[in-house]
Protein backbone atom coordinates (compact mmCIF):
# COMPACT_ATOMS: atom_id res chain seq x y z
CA UNK A 1 0.00 0.00 0.00
CA UNK A 2 2.83 2.40 0.84
CA UNK A 3 4.55 1.72 -2.46
CA UNK A 4 1.33 2.59 -4.27
CA UNK A 5 0.94 5.84 -2.39
CA UNK A 6 4.56 6.70 -2.95
CA UNK A 7 4.33 6.03 -6.67
CA UNK A 8 1.07 7.98 -6.90
CA UNK A 9 2.63 10.80 -4.94
CA UNK A 10 5.56 10.71 -7.36
CA UNK A 11 3.22 11.09 -10.33
CA UNK A 12 1.18 13.95 -8.90
CA UNK A 13 3.91 15.89 -7.16
CA UNK A 14 7.21 17.15 -8.43
CA UNK A 15 8.67 17.04 -4.91
CA UNK A 16 10.16 13.87 -3.57
CA UNK A 17 8.18 12.21 -0.78
CA UNK A 18 9.22 13.42 2.66
CA UNK A 19 9.09 11.57 5.91
CA UNK A 20 8.20 13.11 9.25
CA UNK A 21 11.80 12.91 10.42
CA UNK A 22 12.78 15.27 7.59
CA UNK A 23 10.26 17.84 8.79
CA UNK A 24 11.70 18.09 12.33
CA UNK A 25 14.41 20.72 12.88
CA UNK A 26 17.94 19.41 13.14
CA UNK A 27 19.46 19.89 16.61
CA UNK A 28 22.82 18.27 16.17
CA UNK A 29 24.97 21.26 16.99
CA UNK A 30 24.83 24.24 19.32
CA UNK A 31 21.91 26.58 18.62
CA UNK A 32 24.08 29.68 18.46
CA UNK A 33 25.79 28.65 15.25
CA UNK A 34 24.63 30.53 12.16
CA UNK A 35 25.16 29.56 8.60
CA UNK A 36 25.74 32.05 5.88
CA UNK A 37 24.47 31.30 2.42
CA UNK A 38 25.92 32.87 -0.64
CA UNK A 39 23.55 34.72 -3.03
CA UNK A 40 24.17 32.09 -5.72
CA UNK A 41 22.93 29.34 -3.42
CA UNK A 42 19.69 31.12 -2.53
CA UNK A 43 18.72 31.92 -6.10
CA UNK A 44 16.12 29.43 -7.27
CA UNK A 45 14.79 31.44 -10.20
CA UNK A 46 16.39 30.29 -13.42
CA UNK A 47 14.44 32.66 -15.69
CA UNK A 48 16.59 34.67 -18.04
CA UNK A 49 15.73 37.51 -20.40
CA UNK A 50 15.87 36.21 -23.98
CA UNK A 51 18.47 37.78 -26.18
CA UNK A 52 17.53 39.65 -29.37
CA UNK A 53 18.33 36.71 -31.68
CA UNK A 54 15.84 34.46 -29.87
CA UNK A 55 13.12 37.14 -30.14
CA UNK A 56 13.32 37.40 -33.93
CA UNK A 57 13.15 33.63 -34.22
CA UNK A 58 9.90 33.68 -32.22
CA UNK A 59 8.44 36.37 -34.47
CA UNK A 60 9.46 34.40 -37.55
CA UNK A 61 7.78 31.28 -36.22
CA UNK A 62 4.63 33.24 -35.43
CA UNK A 63 4.54 34.79 -38.90
CA UNK A 64 5.14 31.41 -40.52
CA UNK A 65 2.21 29.86 -38.64
CA UNK A 66 0.00 32.85 -39.50
CA UNK A 67 1.00 32.52 -43.17
CA UNK A 68 0.20 28.81 -43.23
CA UNK A 69 -3.22 29.42 -41.65
CA UNK A 70 -3.92 32.20 -44.17
CA UNK A 71 -2.98 30.01 -47.15
CA UNK A 72 -5.18 27.19 -45.86
CA UNK A 73 -8.07 29.64 -45.38
CA UNK A 74 -7.69 30.99 -48.90
CA UNK A 75 -7.60 27.47 -50.33
CA UNK A 76 -10.81 26.55 -48.49
CA UNK A 77 -12.52 29.75 -49.69
CA UNK A 78 -11.47 29.02 -53.29
CA UNK A 79 -12.78 25.46 -53.11
CA UNK A 80 -16.11 26.66 -51.69
CA UNK A 81 -16.39 29.32 -54.42
CA UNK A 82 -15.74 26.78 -57.19
CA UNK A 83 -18.28 24.34 -55.72
CA UNK A 84 -20.90 27.10 -55.51
CA UNK A 85 -20.25 28.16 -59.09
CA UNK A 86 -20.57 24.57 -60.36
CA UNK A 87 -23.77 24.08 -58.38
CA UNK A 88 -25.31 27.25 -59.85
CA UNK A 89 -24.26 26.22 -63.36
CA UNK A 90 -25.85 22.80 -62.86
CA UNK A 91 -29.04 24.40 -61.58
CA UNK A 92 -29.14 26.77 -64.54
CA UNK A 93 -28.82 23.85 -66.95
CA UNK A 94 -31.63 22.03 -65.15
CA UNK A 95 -33.94 25.03 -65.34
CA UNK A 96 -33.45 25.70 -69.04
CA UNK A 97 -32.07 22.56 -70.66
CA UNK A 98 -32.70 23.26 -74.33
CA UNK A 99 -33.07 27.03 -74.32
CA UNK A 100 -30.31 29.43 -75.21
CA UNK A 101 -31.30 32.97 -74.29
CA UNK A 102 -29.61 35.98 -75.85
CA UNK A 103 -31.22 39.20 -74.58
CA UNK A 104 -29.84 41.39 -77.39
CA UNK A 105 -31.26 39.08 -80.03
CA UNK A 106 -34.59 38.96 -78.22
CA UNK A 107 -34.74 42.77 -78.01
CA UNK A 108 -34.11 43.15 -81.76
CA UNK A 109 -36.89 40.70 -82.59
CA UNK A 110 -39.28 42.44 -80.20
CA UNK A 111 -38.60 45.85 -81.72
CA UNK A 112 -39.08 44.50 -85.24
CA UNK A 113 -42.35 42.86 -84.28
CA UNK A 114 -43.65 46.04 -82.65
CA UNK A 115 -42.81 48.01 -85.79
CA UNK A 116 -44.59 45.47 -87.98
CA UNK A 117 -47.56 45.42 -85.61
CA UNK A 118 -47.76 49.23 -85.83
CA UNK A 119 -47.64 49.11 -89.62
CA UNK A 120 -50.33 46.43 -89.72
CA UNK A 121 -52.59 48.47 -87.43
CA UNK A 122 -52.02 51.61 -89.54
CA UNK A 123 -52.80 49.74 -92.77
CA UNK A 124 -56.01 48.30 -91.25
CA UNK A 125 -57.05 51.79 -90.16
CA UNK A 126 -56.27 53.23 -93.58
CA UNK A 127 -58.22 50.47 -95.34
CA UNK A 128 -61.18 50.99 -93.02
CA UNK A 129 -61.21 54.74 -93.62
CA UNK A 130 -61.00 54.24 -97.41
CA UNK A 131 -63.86 51.74 -97.30
CA UNK A 132 -65.91 54.08 -95.10
CA UNK A 133 -65.44 56.84 -97.67
CA UNK A 134 -66.54 54.52 -100.42
CA UNK A 135 -69.54 53.43 -98.39
CA UNK A 136 -68.52 49.82 -98.02
CA UNK A 137 -68.50 48.16 -94.63
CA UNK A 138 -66.59 45.01 -93.83
CA UNK A 139 -66.76 42.71 -90.94
CA UNK A 140 -63.60 42.24 -88.88
CA UNK A 141 -63.35 38.69 -90.17
CA UNK A 142 -63.17 40.06 -93.73
CA UNK A 143 -60.29 42.45 -92.97
CA UNK A 144 -56.76 42.05 -94.28
CA UNK A 145 -55.03 38.88 -93.22
CA UNK A 146 -52.59 39.53 -90.38
CA UNK A 147 -49.78 37.18 -89.58
CA UNK A 148 -49.91 35.74 -86.08
CA UNK A 149 -47.45 37.40 -83.75
CA UNK A 150 -46.05 36.61 -80.36
CA UNK A 151 -47.80 37.83 -77.31
CA UNK A 152 -45.93 40.91 -76.11
CA UNK A 153 -46.14 42.76 -72.84
CA UNK A 154 -48.14 45.65 -74.31
CA UNK A 155 -50.77 43.22 -75.59
CA UNK A 156 -51.08 41.70 -72.12
CA UNK A 157 -51.36 45.16 -70.53
CA UNK A 158 -54.00 46.23 -73.07
CA UNK A 159 -55.98 43.04 -72.45
CA UNK A 160 -55.90 43.61 -68.70
CA UNK A 161 -57.08 47.23 -68.97
CA UNK A 162 -59.79 46.41 -71.55
From Swiss-Prot:
Residues 1-49 are annotated as: Disordered. The keyword Membrane applies. Its main location: membrane. Residues 32-46 have a biased composition (Polar residues). It is found in: Membrane. GO terms for cellular component: membrane. Disulfide bonds: none annotated. It comes from the Eukaryota. InterPro entries: C3orf18-like. The chain crosses the membrane at residues 62-82. The keyword Membrane applies. Keywords: Membrane, Transmembrane, Transmembrane helix. It is a single-pass membrane protein. Coiled coil: none annotated. This is Uncharacterized protein C3orf18. It comes from Homo sapiens (Human).
Amino acid sequence: MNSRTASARGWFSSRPPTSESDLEPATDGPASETTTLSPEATTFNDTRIPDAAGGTAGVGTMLLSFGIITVIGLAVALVLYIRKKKRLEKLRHQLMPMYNFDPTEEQDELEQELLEHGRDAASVQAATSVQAMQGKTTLPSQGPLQRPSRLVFTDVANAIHA
